Every structure is written in structure tokens, then in C-alpha cells.
Amino acid sequence: MVLILVGMFGWAVYDLTDNEETDRSDFETINESEVETGQRENESEVSEQEQDKGNIGIQVGNEAPNFSLETLSGEKVQLADYRGERVMLNFWATWCPPCRAEMPDMQKFHEQTDIKILAVNLTESEAARQDVHDFVEEYGLTFPILMDENTNVATEYAIRPIPTTYMIDSNGIIQQKSFGPMNYEQMVQALNVME
């Protein structure tokens, strides 16, 4: 059993460091049934002792790495622009069924709370940029859609599977990391533990 786990860990490290060109098959998805059966990895609230504000990284307690991306409408946005506000950083794609399933709850969350949602689209994995535009119109999304054209930000945040969500507090510290779709209640619960 230990040998199997070590082998799986070794493969995961190798797979994450593989720099081949990214396409749709490079990103796994997690569906609702996997979430309900407990296969969802969820790291939540962090005590102040665990927070190292000088430690930039992608783990709970780290300062979230800054990035700059263009929105679907062409505006340049940086994560640092949102310092002082709580941020939900969500990585997604239009072809991902669990991503599609959580979007209505994300829109409701955006409308009913003070959270700032940054939805980073893995644009390189899309068939066409127009698909993203059509998706946004179909779902009536009003929060910023950031276009990760070359999946550089997804790579920096080690995104695999999608959807993946980082809940970042007003100090820029990652408070929760979730793999798989979140529903509205889970989003509110995550928001309530952040500064």
C-alpha cells in the first residue's frame, strides 16, 4: 500500500512538472458526486500563527502570488488591485461540466455579498475565445472574467483539476483552497471565516 502511494505521489510530481503544451485533456474535472462522497480536498481557516505574510505561495496561509491578466472586455487586472478586499479566485473553462454547474451560484454569491470574484478562464483549453463570450452571456455573469491565454497563471497556481477556487482574505492571504465545484452555501461559509 505504501509503495503504491509513493508511486502515485512520484507520478503526480512528475506530471505537475511536465511542461508540454496545455490542452483540454491536461485539466481534470471534479463533479458533484465526487464532492458528495468526500473526495473533495478542502483546506479552510488558518490561524494567525500559521500565516506568514512574507511567504508568497499557493498553500493555505501563504500570500497569494500576484498576476496580471486581461479581462474578456480587454481591461488589465492585477490580483494586487484587490488588496483590502476579500477575493474568490476561481479557475474554470466553458467545456467543464462542474464549472458550468457552479456558475449560477457564483453569480448569486457575487450579487448578494461584498466578495470580489475573479474568474480565470483557461483560455488555451477553449475551442475559441467566442465560446467564453457566449458562455458569459448565457449565464448572465457580471463579475470579471480573466483570460489566461497561455495558462501561465493556472501553471503558477498549479491548477489541476478544475474548477479550483482560492479564497483570499483582505490581506492577500489564502484562507481556503477548494477542488471541485462549490455551491452557494459553501461559498458563504468560506466568506464568513475571512477578514
Provide a role label for each language-model segment.
Residues M1-E63:
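N-terminal targeting signals for export/organelle localization
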Residues I56-G61, N66-V87:
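A short beta-strand-turn-helix
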Residues G84-R86, T113-K116, T142-F143:
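Loop/turn elements at helix/coil->beta-strand transitions in domains of secreted/extracellular proteins
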Residues M88-N90, A119-N121, M167:
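Hydrophobic beta-strand core positions in alpha/beta domains
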Residues R100-Y139, E149-E156:
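Structural microenvironment flanking redox-active thiols in thiol-disulfide oxidoreductases
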